[in-house]
Amino acid sequence: MISGILASPGIAFGNVLLLKKEEIVINRQNISTENIKTEINKFFNGRKKSVKQLTEIKIATGEKFGKKKEGIFEGHIMLLEDEELEKEIINLITEKKISAAEATKFIIEGQAKALEKIKDEYLKNRAIDVRDIGSRLLKNILNISIVDLNNIKNQVILISKDLTPSETAQINLKYILGFITDLGGPTSHTSIMARSLEIPAIVGTVNITKKVKNNDFIILDSLNNEIIINPSDQIINEKKQVERKYFFKKENLKKLRNLYATTTDGHNIKIGSNIGNIQDIYSAKKNGAECIGLYRTEFLFMGRNALPTENEQFQAYKEIAESMENKPVIIRTMDIGGDKDLPYMNLPKEENPFLGWRAIRISMDRKEILHAQLRAILRASAFGKIYILFPMIISVEEIRTLKIEVHKLQIQLKKEHLVFDENIKIGIMIETPASAIIADHLIKEVDFFSIGTNDLTQYTLAVDRGNDLISHLYNPISPSVIQLIKQVIDISHLHGKWTGMCGELAGDERVTTLLLGMGLDEFSMSSTSIPKIKEIIRKTSFSKSQELAKKVLKAATTKEILDLLNKFII
């Protein structure tokens, strides 16, 4: 039995089709001065062909997944046509006298590797998109045929080293019952599209392509993270029963999507979605998100060769605000640094990047970046209910400085006769012990708090969650972290304000009742977690969850907390 990473839940039974992709090997070959123009033309012709293909895929994607998913390939086309990318490739061809193919591979691979260094899974997985674009461009430069999944005419479970977003967009559910890959993660566009298709998928198995051969019969059970090769009749029958139970459970959860998260004794909780771009809105709305609890704007800055302009940002924020139809959209300003690098910004190499020049610290030092982003957010606020969220705040002075900047920009926009929400709400991320400890001072300066449990846990426990030697110590259910969360929530309520949570803990089913009992006002999570969290809240008594919270807050160890959570009966 083989396992991997859940990309999209479900069960599939079928024969294997191995999708083999040969790596394109480009041997170093210097070109003559006379051939430079020829190679540059090869690049332009390859790009033109790639844009045409991606435009066709974009249209087909819109028809299959809905208009919102077209944005994935609009992004691909934008990167292909990016002036900085073009300039870098042409400069390499001209100055180093290398072929268009070699120059393209060098530049694209550099961008992909920069993204892979990022610990944030969502941004890290954008490397797959960059390589997808680069591979297409490279093949078109070299006149190599591109894989077309539309040619599959038998029912199969597709197995490959990886699947790119453009390949996933070609999946025909009539013939492709599910897919498994060696590479990939849960937040890649491939996984996101698989969830939109509701097709069973497991990624990140490392070596599934070496464990199976064509026509092997397999069971792909992504519910239990199991891949069973050539199973017995008994196992097939057992898994068929699991499939039936899952189908009925899924249908019941669908009914909850558009219901409110109201406890059995009438306490209402707001449930939101964390997103990275416009394509995620479709899944958020489909799963019943009442708001966007976190819009990670970093994605706008990644996978490109220059900072996004104010207008580019404005269009992105405006589209999301309009798509949410006046439901709250909390836009976090750029959270770059730490493990999120932007090659074109030449960020310094630091010994402790997570304790260094990152997030709001960069924005405050680079006022042109801050101003462009805040102006874009303010302008977009005329088209929906937008809130501003500042990350990595550790002092009252920072907030006051930022509020002055917002006010200055509001005056600017008025002079330019541009419309915006003059009463726009401003909040801060609580993701350091410093901000949690002085929450009583910070809350007087803002409208709301949003707890980022990923960084709060890391900083509170002094544990680098990306360090395999100590990652076992990273535990958001640690008594110290739970105490800080409770303190922050209570302080916000004392001042008549509210606290949300956008870290991974918000979507963790084990602690839903605990967070509810601690008084958390808003849970924001991955869209696919929303129906299940709503189900738990709707079955829970608020008063009983408060009793649970009181007991948990007295616990001295994580084990004691988990024991209390496991014993709690809804």
Swiss-Prot record:
It comes from Buchnera aphidicola subsp. Schizaphis graminum (strain Sg). It is found in: Cytoplasm. One of its GO terms (biological process) is phosphoenolpyruvate-dependent sugar phosphotransferase system. InterPro entries: PEP-util_enz_mobile_dom, PEP-utilizing_PTS_enzyme, PEP_util_AS, PEP_util_C, PEP_util_CS, Phosphohistidine_dom_sf, PTS_EI, PTS_EI-like. The active site is at H189, C502. It catalyses: L-histidyl-[protein] + phosphoenolpyruvate = N(pros)-phospho-L-histidyl-[protein] + pyruvate. Keywords: Cytoplasm, Kinase, Magnesium, Metal-binding, Phosphotransferase system, Sugar transport, Transferase, Transport. One of its GO terms (cellular component) is cytoplasm. Homodimer. The N-terminal domain contains the HPr binding site, the central domain the pyrophosphate/phosphate carrier histidine, and the C-terminal domain the pyruvate binding site. Transmembrane segments: none annotated. Its main location: cytoplasm. Phosphoenolpyruvate binds at R296, R332, N454, D455, R465. Belongs to the PEP-utilizing enzyme family. This is Phosphoenolpyruvate-protein phosphotransferase. Its EC number is 2.7.3.9. The lineage of its organism: Bacteria, Pseudomonadati, Pseudomonadota, Gammaproteobacteria, Enterobacterales. Its cofactor is Mg(2+).
